[in-house]
């Protein structure tokens, strides 16, 4: 599986996880950046477009989801993206940040996202890291930090 195919499968799996999470009181509006003709593109947040953006208008809950392959978690580009996303969520009434990664990359994803959240004094924003088995995104493990 190429890097872009792997990223696309992570985005799709993350969108399904977010949509199916029990946090929603109502079905959320979900925007997913996979250009499949079935979903609209997520909005720009700062200068960055997340892979998934979900919102329940009635409860003001927003979830920003980002999928990262193993080689793309701990770098400047991701740091800038996550900074934009935590800035947005920090000023939202209710929000969560979700990160979808390959199974063996969960520790790095938790470390990077918690570090940026702490740097921005946004510890009140929940982080959910979903680690998927490569090639079988129905096998996953979830960490909420």
Residue spans for each PLM region:
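Nuclease catalytic cores
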Residues: 1-19
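Well-ordered, non-membrane alpha-helical segments in soluble/globular domains
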Residues: 9-15, 76-85, 109-116
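Conserved catalytic cores of phosphodiester-cleaving nucleases, focusing on short active-site segments
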Residues: 52-78, 82-85
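Domain-level recognition of nuclease-like catalytic cores that cleave nucleotide substrates
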Residues: 100-145
């Amino acid at each position: 599986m190429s890097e872009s195919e792997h990223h696309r499968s992570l985005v799709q799996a993350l969108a399904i996880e977010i949509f199916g999470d029990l946090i929603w009181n109502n079905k959320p509006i979900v925007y997913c950046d996979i250009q499949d003709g079935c979903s609209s593109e997520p909005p720009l947040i700062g200068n960055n477009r997340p892979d998934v953006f979900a919102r329940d208008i009635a409860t003001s809950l927003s979830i920003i989801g980002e999928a990262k392959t193993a080689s793309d978690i701990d770098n400047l580009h991701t740091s800038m993206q996550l900074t934009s996303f935590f800035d947005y969520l920090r000023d939202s009434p209710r929000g969560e940040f979700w990160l979808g990664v390959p199974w063996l990359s969960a520790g790095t994803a938790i470390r990077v996202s918690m570090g940026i959240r702490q740097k921005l004094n946004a510890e009140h924003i929940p982080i959910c890291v979903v680690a998927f088995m490569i090639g079988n995104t129905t096998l996953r493990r979830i960490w909420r930090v």
